[in-house]
């Protein structure tokens, strides 16, 4: 078949035109200075719908858009693409999980064998007495509502007509939401900093941050006041995003209402919803993965209010040294009245270091003379062995290099110690920052709580403690088991990857940590002696056991039905002749007869001997024996009588499950 010349020419013209358009399109799309149509649409949207100016944004009026002031880190001239690394590791771990079962959710643990070097230069803050700091507000911050309730963090006391509503909200949320709902979300707060804090000048080349807030069935106004306070008091050019992680809430106000409300900020505030209840610990790790814009991750509990000029002091140490983790000074927001006051305890300035006792209960101890000598002024950051865990800042990449939280920790408890030990023993530092203050609401008595999901099983917090001490405490773990003997046989899962992490990173021993960083712990909480016996204290051949009934610091113990669940019925008697429950000792009461339980250290209340063969507890000082009344449910001491069955006891081990 013969083709006509005209047909061939027309075909060549069409093909040539198509190729020309392709070349032209490629050249236009490759020009970085010429925004794409989608980019222009986003810019038009930002111009027409600017983010609300909440004050203190550090930018010119009308310019509230996020503008990073520090570039993303480069190593040897190559931008670090962490996201591609995470995707590869996620795919690899998914393959391993399907191949070998869910042995350990260690997606983050295998990503790094070494930490990246510090490549960013940041100048030290400078104290100029009498010269107002460059991040200090020039005028008092505006009230949310002029003259409104709760402004300047003054207490709001409701009348008796609100009693029923207040009690119902405390049961549901842990706070007096009736009062909270009357207070402006943008309320002003009091300034509890030392005067010297106002005269620090910070290099403005600070790292940017993503603020991560995890919530589960939180009250509306306490959650939103947290968000509002961050936006109101954080310079806008450093606030990359606020990431809300909804940990499977079922409250209606946290669904569509929340989704619509955060549109007020045009994408600055984002919400991600877990498909099941993960618990606070793993939800925070999820938050780290979702928060991709800021160079620093700042974690806040869902019921906080940041204070005046909180950001620069908190992030400056991290900008100087990427392996530093910082913690603000945490003030107390009264859950009934919403007054903000300093936390009690600490040294003469109210400063304390984070600590623990050997049963792994969180403690605060005064700042030591050694730590004070390391500072030139009393408002400089200082070292702390541990953090409380709810509020802290850490460089995002460094947190990933550390493996985030141990993926084997469940729901809540122990994660604050795990991340603290990991930071210190593996080359980082943990600093408390006196000039950064954040108020925190503590749950009130009467809260019904948020029970863990069924898939978690029993004793998640105790299992977390066991897992942490098995990974990080080395030979010191024996002291934990002396304090919590019921946990000795508790299954804690696979920790092989965590131990490999320690080995790969040449992490230091717990002995080094106790001698160099946590050297003051044993002065406040001496190493516990070995136990002679432990378990429930049951009346011989009866179904009644000694029960503290949750009382501490002077309450009388009672006799109650044995339940074999430990808790208030779990006691131990040690080689120092102390009969103890956690950090409390049994002793005779003021009447010289009834037995009470009170806080003690290892030098107090060495009063008891247990004669196992005789089924007898003897009070050494008085020579009397431990006795009971099964009718009155009382526990007391009385003259010893070998034939008296109410003086015969047995201690039976109880293992947690």
From Swiss-Prot:
Its main location: Golgi. Pathway: Protein modification; protein glycosylation. GO terms for cellular component: Golgi apparatus; Golgi membrane. Residues 532-652 form the Ricin B-type lectin domain. Pfam families: Glycos_transf_2, Ricin_B_lectin. It is a single-pass type II membrane protein. InterPro entries: GalNAc-T, Glyco_trans_2-like, Nucleotide-diphossugar_trans, Ricin_B-like_lectins, Ricin_B_lectin. Residues 206-317 are annotated as: Catalytic subdomain A. Highly expressed in sublingual gland. Expressed at lower level in stomach, small intestiine and colon. Residues 381-443 are annotated as: Catalytic subdomain B. SUPFAM superfamilies: Nucleotide-diphospho-sugar transferases, Ricin B-like lectins. Its EC number is 2.4.1.41. The keyword NAD does not apply. It is found in: Golgi apparatus membrane. Glycopeptide transferase involved in O-linked oligosaccharide biosynthesis, which catalyzes the transfer of an N-acetyl-D-galactosamine residue to an already glycosylated peptide. In contrast to other proteins of the family, it does not act as a peptide transferase that transfers GalNAc onto serine or threonine residue on the protein receptor, but instead requires the prior addition of a GalNAc on a peptide before adding additional GalNAc moieties. Some peptide transferase activity is however not excluded, considering that its appropriate peptide substrate may remain unidentified. Belongs to the glycosyltransferase 2 family. GalNAc-T subfamily. This is N-acetylgalactosaminyltransferase 7. It comes from Rattus norvegicus.
């Amino acid at each position: 078949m013969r083709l006509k010349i005209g047909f061939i020419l027309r075909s060549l013209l069409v093909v040539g035109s198509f190729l020309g358009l392709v070349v032209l399109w490629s050249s236009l799309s490759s020009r970085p200075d010429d925004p794409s149509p989608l980019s222009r649409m986003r810019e038009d949207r930002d111009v027409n719908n600017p983010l609300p100016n909440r004050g203190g944004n550090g930018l010119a009026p009308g310019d509230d858009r996020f503008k990073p002031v520090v570039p993303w880190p480069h190593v040897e001239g190559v931008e670090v693409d962490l996201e591609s690394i995470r995707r590869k590791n996620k795919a690899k771990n998914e393959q391993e999980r399907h191949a070998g079962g869910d042995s350990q959710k260690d997606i983050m643990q295998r990503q790094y064998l070494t930490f990246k070097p510090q490549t960013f230069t940041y100048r030290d803050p400078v104290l100029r007495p009498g010269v107002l700091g460059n991040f200090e507000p020039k005028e008092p911050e505006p009230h949310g509502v002029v003259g409104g309730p709760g402004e300047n963090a003054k207490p709001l006391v409701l009348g008796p007509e609100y009693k029923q509503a207040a009690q119902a909200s405390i049961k549901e949320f842990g706070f007096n939401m009736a009062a909270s709902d009357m207070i402006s979300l943008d309320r002003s707060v009091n300034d509890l900093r030392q005067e010297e804090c106002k005269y620090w000048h910070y290099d403005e080349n600070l790292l940017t941050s993503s603020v991560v807030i995890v919530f589960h069935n939180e009250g509306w106004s306490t959650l939103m006041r947290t968000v509002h306070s961050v936006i109101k008091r954080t310079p806008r050019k450093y606030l990359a995003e606020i990431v809300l992680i909804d940990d499977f809430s079922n409250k209606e106000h946290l669904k569509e209402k929340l989704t619509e409300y955060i549109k007020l900020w045009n994408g600055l505030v984002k919400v991600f919803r877990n498909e099941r209840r993960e618990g606070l610990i793993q939800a925070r790790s999820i938050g780290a993965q979702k928060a991709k814009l800021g160079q620093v991750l700042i974690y806040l509990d869902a019921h906080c209010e940041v204070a005046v000029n909180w950001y620069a002091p908190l992030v400056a140490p991290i900008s100087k040294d990427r392996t530093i983790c910082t913690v603000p000074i945490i003030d107390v927001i009264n859950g009934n009245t919403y007054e903000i006051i300093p936390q009690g305890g600490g040294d003469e300035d109210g400063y304390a270091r984070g600590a623990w006792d050997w049963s792994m209960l969180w403690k605060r101890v005064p700042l030591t003379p050694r730590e004070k000598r390391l500072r030139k002024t009393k408002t400089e950051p200082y070292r702390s062995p541990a953090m409380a865990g709810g509020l802290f800042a850490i460089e995002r990449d460094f947190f990933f290099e550390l493996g985030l939280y141990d993926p084997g920790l469940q729901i809540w408890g122990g994660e604050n110690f795990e991340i603290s030990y990991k930071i210190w023993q593996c080359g980082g530092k943990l600093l408390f920052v006196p000039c950064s203050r954040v108020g925190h609401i503590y749950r009130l008595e009467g809260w019904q709580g948020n029970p863990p999901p069924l898939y978690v099983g029993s004793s998640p917090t105790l299992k977390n403690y066991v897992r942490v001490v098995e990974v990080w405490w080395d030979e010191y773990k024996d002291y934990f088991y002396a304090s919590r003997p019921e946990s000795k046989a508790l299954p804690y899962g696979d920790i092989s990857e965590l131990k490999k992490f320690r080995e790969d990173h040449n992490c230091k021993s717990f002995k080094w940590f106790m001698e160099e960083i946590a050297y003051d712990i044993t002065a406040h909480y001496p190493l516990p002696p070995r136990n002679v016996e432990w378990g429930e204290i049951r009346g011989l051949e009866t179904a009644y056991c000694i029960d503290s009934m949750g009382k501490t610091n002077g309450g009388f113990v009672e006799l109650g039905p044995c339940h074999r669940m430990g808790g208030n019925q779990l006691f131990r008697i040690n080689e120092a002749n102390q009969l103890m429950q956690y950090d409390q000792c049994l002793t005779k009461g003021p009447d010289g007869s009834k037995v009470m339980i009170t806080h003690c250290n290892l030098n107090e209340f060495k009063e008891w001997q247990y004669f196992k063969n005789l089924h007898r507890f003897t009070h050494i000082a008085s020579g009397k024996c431990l006795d009971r009344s099964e009718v009155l449910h009382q526990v007391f001491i009385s003259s010893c009588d070998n034939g008296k069955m109410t003086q015969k006891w047995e201690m039976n081990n109880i293992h947690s499950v």
